[in-house]
């Protein structure tokens, strides 16, 4: 009987400690839940700030560096960022982890933003860009044509907000060369006003009638 009393007595404090420990665990669980909510809220705010930009990861490569102790591996990411309204940039990031490499690429792309001259949803005139052994040709297209491009070229054009265009890639099919050739072509575009001012002519003498109509429709002056 004393043994039973001792066991009962021992179980009494244990039973008392059980609810306390359960309460503590629940409290810890509540604290952890609150922490997750705060972190999720922070991520939600960042997502809202970044929602205005379109981000496309073109390619991710693993590279290695031979050192005295062996090999060190890292990752590189080629990223395109644009607002879908004529603003676009290209970035190349390198880090030990893929997410960090992508983030570095996004930051570099935002630093290299440039404006693409557009009329309605296409480019102003045919143009060709080159980078290393890559060559990309771009031609304006009528409304409803869509983006006739593939791979890296399409990523750049869609981030820039170009909806109707014809393209052809020649030479190297390396994604980095193709992307930089596309960017070189877009940077070579000129506005009709710039060409007219340089030649000393009027806008009607320089720009085709179809281009002027498309521009007027885009501006809403022609219904």
Swiss-Prot record:
Positions of region (Disordered): 1-48
Example GO BP: translation
Q: Which residues form the S5 DRBM domain?
A: 53-116
**By its UniProt entry, which SUPFAM superfamilies does this protein fall under?**
dsRNA-binding domain-like, Ribosomal protein S5 domain 2-like
The reply to whether Ribonucleoprotein figures as a keyword in the UniProt entry is yes
Looking up InterPro entries in the UniProt record yields: Ribosomal_Su5_D2-typ_SF, Ribosomal_uS5, Ribosomal_uS5_bac-type, Ribosomal_uS5_C, Ribosomal_uS5_N, Ribosomal_uS5_N_CS, Ribsml_uS5_D2-typ_fold_subgr
Answer whether the UniProt record assigns the keyword rRNA-binding to this protein: yes
Keywords carried by this UniProt record: Ribonucleoprotein, Ribosomal protein, RNA-binding, rRNA-binding
- Which Pfam family, just one, is annotated for this protein? Ribosomal_S5
Q: Which domain of life is it from?
A: Bacteria
Q: Which Gene3D superfamilies match?
A: 3.30.160.20, 3.30.230.10
Q: Where is the composition biased (Basic and acidic residues)?
A: 29-42
Give GO cellular component annotations, separated by semicolons.
small ribosomal subunit
A GO MF annotation of the entry reads: structural constituent of ribosome
The domain-related comment in the record is: The N-terminal domain interacts with the head of the 30S subunit; the C-terminal domain interacts with the body and contacts protein S4. The interaction surface between S4 and S5 is involved in control of translational fidelity.
* Subunit record text: Part of the 30S ribosomal subunit. Contacts proteins S4 and S8.
Q: What does the similarity note say?
A: Belongs to the universal ribosomal protein uS5 family.
| Function, as annotated | With S4 and S12 plays an important role in translational accuracy. Located at the back of the 30S subunit body where it stabilizes the conformation of the head with respect to the body.
In Swiss-Prot or TrEMBL terms, this protein is called Small ribosomal subunit protein uS5
Q: Which organism is it from?
A: Rhodococcus erythropolis (strain PR4 / NBRC 100887)
